[in-house]
Structure formats: structure tokens, C-alpha cells
Amino acid sequence: MTTRSISVHQDISTASWRSFWQKAAALFLREGQLLGRDVFRDAGCPVGTASRAEDLRVDGRGCEDYRCAEVETDVVSNTSGSARVKLGETDILVGIKAEMGTPKLEKPDEGYLEFFVDCSSNSPELEGRGGEELGTDIANTLYRVFSCENSVDLKSLCINPKEHCWVLYVDVLLLECGGNIFDAISIAVKAALFNTRIPKVRVLEDEEGTKEIELSDDPYDCIRLNVDEVPCIVTLSKIGYRHVVDATLQEEACSLASLLISVTSKGAISSMKKVGKGSLDPESIFEMMETGQRVGKSLHIALQKILDEEENLGTSRPKVGFLG
């Protein structure tokens, strides 16, 4: 992701700025809250100021730059697959457990995924009911993202149609919240799915027609999931006239509205969701969609490169885990 810096200088009189802030304050007092209104636009902010045009944020990143991310797989021993992702101050742990279950009536020849999200007490701001509501919101978002038929090959999880299938229980643990949790969680889920290994099974039938399931004892005789079409979430936060990716907590506090876009490795958008009390005009939405597709493709490439490198290292790769 390339950092771009554009400097625009324009002389603005003190009287002009005073008039602008007076109008902005009047809007706050009249509305009580923003309610989707772009205060900077309605108050008549002078056009062409440096804050509108510069591709520079407080921490030195460009508007389309992510913070440094650390990805590690196979960090929990008693799971079928696991991953830990640290994105800035945000810390996510995902564990996947494959268990046998019964296929759903509407899809008798497919397995399925179940998502559970726990907001750790290590994040004081997420204690109590607030954490429960956030966990439910994250789980519902993941269900929506993975509702696309091509995201995961669920037919490969079927053992015996209408009778047995693999159910993947995806447990998401939010260890620390430092902004942009949806993107970090989607990265961790994809990495954990890549790391998941499901034992191969054989269906044996005796003379009486009774079926038995036999699991392979060989740890290398397993099924690997194809994660090429698993989408990643790109959250774009609208701040003033611009939108940024991978917002920090401070930037999220300044944003009136954000757009969550799930993007595949080919840049296709599989779902979208607006969060926040503010509104987004059509032009901004189209710009954010284009940015999400562009940034999403780069994110997939970078993540897949890391996953492939870890895969090639095999057992020789150094493990950091929770003691690093």
C-alpha cells in the first residue's frame, strides 16, 4: 500500500475561520447531535484547505495505509486451526474446532460454520452489556460475510448427506481493542481457516445397512480448506471530506459513519454494511467502494504471502505465541 502525500497551501483569513466555527457550533447546538449531518459542509468550510487534500494522518500514514500487522497461525494446540493477529493495538485470537454434526434441513449435503465472539475483560471499555452487544454484532457480521456461497466450500464438509457433516465452530476472542476490530477479526478468521486441518473419514456399512464413521489416525491424512474466496473486511471511516482505512480509536471517535466492505482476493465486493449515526452521500459511497476494492486486493496479497511463508517453513518456523 503506497503512502501518498499531497501538500496544499491556501491563505485563509482569521475572520473566515471564526465565521466557520461559529456556524459549526450553531449546528451542534441546534441539532443536539450530528444525526448524519456533515458539519464541515453545512457550515461552509473553506474549500481547498490542506486538511481536505493532504494524504497524511496524525501517525504518519496515508489514508489508504494499514498499521503494521502481525499474523501467527497454529497458536492453540487443542484446536483444528488457530491464528492470532495484532493490528496496531488491536489483538485478536481465533480458534476453530471441527466437530461432527447433522446437516441443516435446507442444505442436507453441506457442513456449516458457527461463530462465537467473546470480548475479553482485558478491554475495560467492553465490560458488561456493551461487550455482549458488540460480540453479537461481530458474530452477525461474520455470518453475513460468510453467507456468500463461494466463500467456503461447504460441500467438502459433508460426510454423509442428511446424516453427518463437519461443523466448524469459530471462536473469536478480542484480547485488546485498539480500533478497526472488524478488519483484524476477518484477517484472523481467514488465517485460522487456512490453518485448519480436518481428519479424513470413511463411511463403513455392514451387512445390515448400519453405517459407521471411521476417522483416520494419521495427522497428515486430513482435509484442507480452500480459502482463496474467503473475503476480508475493509472498514472505511469517513472523517470530514476524506475516508481512511484501519482507523485508530482516536480516528473512530472523529468519524460520523463508516462503511464495512467484505472484499474477495479478486476485488469483488460480497457484502456491505454502514455503521455509525452519520449519513453517507452516494458519491462518497462509490468512492469508498472503489477504495475498498483496491485496498482489499492488496490486503489479500499481503496476507496470503505471510500464510504461504509460514506453510513453507513447516515445523521449523519459530513460534511466538503468548510468551513472545
Segments the model singles out, each with a brief description of its role:
Residues T2-G324:
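Polyanion-binding surfaces on beta-sheet-dominated domains and ring/shell assemblies
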